[in-house]
């Protein structure tokens, strides 16, 4: 099995109590040897998000509309044109530091990426020291692209589309505020066709905590003609990941996917 990863946009993570959740897909993938490459991108245009979704399924909404609800994103009929919230909406300082994908049938790790230790806050800091470190980091990042880290590009071999059940482990840290009803809704499209929706509950997370959760992705079989089209159309398979705390949208990340086993773009 060939597994290749390239870290350009480190995913964010950390560790503590581990939780496993599962969700069924509206369409998906299935079984053994897969290679995967991941590229970080710039995440689209800078500044506050300028597009969103209404209950009608429209994928555009003014950036100042900060009341995007879970029900609205569940009714989207296409990938969003831009981010539905600004990077500054993450007032809970949720920071993903590690991400791993594994085939649950074979146990094979298909992909793993982590933020370098130098970019993670060391353990054992007091709350004041942690807040000071965060403030120093923000001052260094003032001129950076506000959407950096919100977009990632993956390249898989065609075999990935044969996988039936995949475990995605994410590790993350939380800032000074607790997370109540932390939830992720992930929508996958091929062009304007909805492939699958995943809806995961993280539950409650303590302030200044490190957390590990594994989401179980259960994929039904895709029609052979659709699989062939997805393989021949790299990066036309895309996803939106929406993160809510107490039904308030606090993070929106994007990704696109290729299944042709090609080189990193």
Curated annotation (Swiss-Prot):
GO cellular component, alphabetical, reads:
cilium
Q: What GO terms in the biological process aspect are recorded for it?
A: cilium assembly; lipoprotein transport; nervous system development
Q: In which tissues is it expressed?
A: Expressed in nervous system.
For this protein, the record's InterPro entries field holds: Ig_E-set, PDE6D_unc-119_myristoyl-bd, PDED_dom, PDED_dom_sf
The record's GO molecular-function terms, alphabetically, read: lipid binding
Positions contributing to tetradecanoate binding:
154
Low complexity: bias regions: 13-37, 47-57
Annotated family: Belongs to the PDE6D/unc-119 family.
How does the record comment on the protein's domains?
Adopts an immunoglobulin-like beta-sandwich fold forming a hydrophobic cavity that capture N-terminally myristoylated target peptides. Phe residues within the hydrophobic beta sandwich are required for myristate binding.
Region: Disordered; residue ranges are 1-69
Q: Provide the species name.
A: Drosophila melanogaster (Fruit fly)
Gene field: unc-119
Query: What Pfam families is this protein classified in?
Result: GMP_PDE_delta
User: What keywords were assigned to this record?
Assistant: Lipid-binding, Protein transport, Transport
User: What is the name attached to this protein's record?
Assistant: Protein unc-119 homolog
- Relate the protein's function as given in its record: Myristoyl-binding protein that acts as a cargo adapter: specifically binds the myristoyl moiety of a subset of N-terminally myristoylated proteins and is required for their localization.
